[in-house]
Regions:
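Glycine-rich phosphate/pyrophosphate-handling loop used in enzymes and phosphotransfer proteins
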Residues: 1-183
Length: 183
């Protein structure tokens, strides 16, 4: 996907957005890397809406192979789905990130709990970036020196992934990267 960007939007081996996050002292070196498979265009927006909001769980099958291949290339101790709030989980009936992992025939490990419940999709980029941490570590979990991959459906601003990564890094995680279906 990086090769599709104009040169103005690339800084070395990262996109402008990741570069911008790294320029902020409080977020630098929080997330090691993100892999997104598809461009978040109108088609994918509609497909993901069917998946997340209308319960078309089978759509996860479309992305399972990409996720499995990406994660099999790395030494991973934990594959962590981005958690939903209890309210969102009740609305949808499933966690779309966890479903993506399961459909890839991998084992999700729920290390994080969401402690902030407002919908991210209703917030501006600045509001998302300025949030207090929205995650906490599950009790009695040791991630010290572990390599972790976060899985989410859509990378919009990177805020959700970076908050999750910051929580894991604060607990001693060695390496935290992410995989998203679309960006």
């Amino acid at each position: 996907m990086l090769e599709e960007l104009k040169e103005d939007y690339i800084h070395g081996t990262v996109c402008h957005d990741c570069f911008r996050w790294e320029q902020q002292d409080s977020w630098a070196n929080t997330l090691d890397h993100n892999i997104s498979f598809y461009k978040y265009d109108t088609f994918l927006k509609n497909l993901m809406a069917r998946y997340k909001y209308r319960g078309d769980y089978a759509i996860a099958d479309l992305f399972a192979k990409d996720i499995k291949i990406a994660l099999s290339k790395s030494k991973v101790d934990y594959i962590v789905p981005i958690p939903l709030s209890e309210e969102r989980l009740l609305e949808r009936g499933f966690n779309q990130s966890e479903a993506l992992i399961r459909k890839a025939m991998l084992k999700p490990t729920n290390l994080l709990v969401r402690i902030h419940t407002e919908k991210q999709s209703k917030k501006s980029r600045k509001e998302r970036m300025d949030l207090d941490n929205i995650f906490q570590l599950q009790q009695a979990v040791n991630v010290k020196d572990k390599n972790i991959f976060l899985v989410d459906d859509i990378y919009t601003t990177g805020s959700t992934l970076r908050h999750a990564s910051k929580t894991l890094r604060s607990a001693g995680a060695n390496y935290v990267s992410s995989v998203t279906v679309a960006r």
